[in-house]
Design a protein with these regions (language model features):
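Membrane-water interface at the C-terminal end of transmembrane alpha helices
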Residues: 113-133
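Interfacial segments of alpha-helical transmembrane regions
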Residues: 5-17, 74-79
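Structural signal for membrane-spanning alpha-helices in multi-pass inner-membrane proteins
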Residues: 27, 61-66, 90-94, 118-124
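Non-cytosolic membrane-interface motifs at loop->transmembrane helix junctions
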Residues: 36-46, 75, 99-110
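Membrane-helix boundary connector in multi-pass membrane proteins
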Residues: 66, 70, 88-106
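Membrane-helix boundary elements
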Residues: 6-12, 20-45
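Core segments of alpha-helical transmembrane spans in multipass integral membrane proteins
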Residues: 18, 22-23, 45-66, 80-88
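Hydrophobic alpha-helical membrane segments
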Residues: 51, 75-92, 112-117
Length: 133
């Protein structure tokens, strides 16, 4: 029964791990590509390269949850809150600081994905309480 309760948690953790690894590797090793795709003014790649390392670390933690979710409630809570804040942060500029130079797909689609993942982590927290805490 406990395995059924944490199935959503495992799927969500694996999905987030894959997304975090892909974005992390891209930001860490190819920041110039991200800058070019954003359509904004060029910046020094080091300004966003650090973000790649942080994303890889979060992806690794999420993969660890996928493998063994026992007693990982605090990390799942952190991922739930973090993905929500990232999603809302990505939506801020298109809503409040609209500029025709924005690459809307690069901001809105990841924002929606992060908000959905946050919601899935939140549901997983509720369903898997006895496993996570």
């Amino acid at each position: 029964m406990a395995e059924k309760k944490n199935q959503l948690l495992k799927i969500t953790a694996l999905l987030y791990a894959i997304i975090a690894f892909l974005y992390g590797l891209n930001y860490l090793f190819f920041p110039e590509l991200q800058i070019k795709m954003s359509g904004t003014e060029p910046i020094h790649p080091a300004w966003i390269r650090w973000f790649g390392g942080a994303m890889i670390a979060l992806g690794y933690g999420s993969f660890r949850i996928f493998r063994n979710p026992a007693k990982q409630g605090i990390f799942v809570t952190t991922l739930c809150l973090g993905t929500l804040l990232v999603g809302l942060g990505l939506l801020y500029d298109p809503i409040f600081n609209w500029d025709s130079s924005f690459n809307l797909l690069e901001q809105v689609i990841p924002a929606i994905v992060m908000i959905i993942i946050s919601f899935l982590f939140w549901i997983s927290l509720r369903k898997s309480k006895e496993i996570l805490w």
